[in-house]
Amino acid sequence: MTSPVDLEAPSVPTDGEAIRPKKYRWLREIGVVVGFYYVYETVRSLADHAGITNHAYSNARRLVVWEGWLHIFHEQVIQQAFVGATWFIRMMNIYYGTLHFVITAGLLVWMYRKRHEGYKEMRNLLGLTTALALIGYWLFPLAPPRLYKCNNNIPVPGPDGFTLGKCFVDTLDKVGGLWSYHSPIAKAVANQYAAMPSLHFGWALWCAIVLFRFGRHRATRVAAFFYPLLTLFAIVVTANHWFLDAAGGAVIVLSAVWITRLHQRRGDRQRLQRVRSSA
């Protein structure tokens, strides 16, 4: 008589096991993100072509008029209220030059390791937001406030003689931070007229979406609310962006969300049709 054979049901991965990233897949993700950012920087630099300067300043003059119509042309007032506090402006310069990358990259890593079920969606949303920003840089080159000349370029008397009169202080150059647009490296790679839309503000909104959707603590919700506001203040007080640049950043994020959801609904319909056809 043969001995009975114990039959065991095949093991079914739990939810956590099913979504856990495979070993070394993170290397591929690093390659995807770094490669995409390299393409982004290359295309953004190509947008800084010959003849763009006059176009960028013309657009800046138009934007100032638009902000005047909307009663939001207050960037100079805000900067003048804080520019005397050198330590504070230097802190804002460091904030502007670092957290834009550090927090965004940190949240990507956190999503990959702790909220992997939503990582791909959020990664694609960030990539689409960044790609839409490139379209804005090509279509609407814009001189930021720190480069904007006042008085319609009519020389006016000042303590150092007749000058064109600058509305804004280039805080990265005058006060300092971790880097400056006048450094050799920045001059070689930076497109100073890639201001509309503000990707600083757009990425900050992306971070807020991640924290609101996937954060499980009240502190993360509070951070999600205040981080975009603090970023808006930083880009304005350092004279790197206009208020309408931030509005443009919000537009590309909302557009990316809409496109992403449209793509998801289309995919859901296609999967449903395949299930019905196979039934």
At which residue positions do the language-model features occur?
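Membrane-proximal cytoplasmic C-terminal regulatory module of class A 7TM GPCRs
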Residues: 259-279
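Membrane-interfacial catalytic/cofactor-binding modules of polytopic membrane enzymes
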Residues: 139-214
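Aromatic-anchored segments of alpha-helical transmembrane domains
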Residues: 38-42, 130-138, 226-239
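N-terminal transmembrane-helix/juxtamembrane module of multi-pass inner/ER membrane proteins
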Residues: 2-10, 15-102
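Interfacial helix-loop-helix junctions of multi-pass membrane proteins
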Residues: 141-151, 191-196, 230-256
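Interfacial segments of alpha-helical transmembrane regions
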Residues: 100, 104-140, 146-160
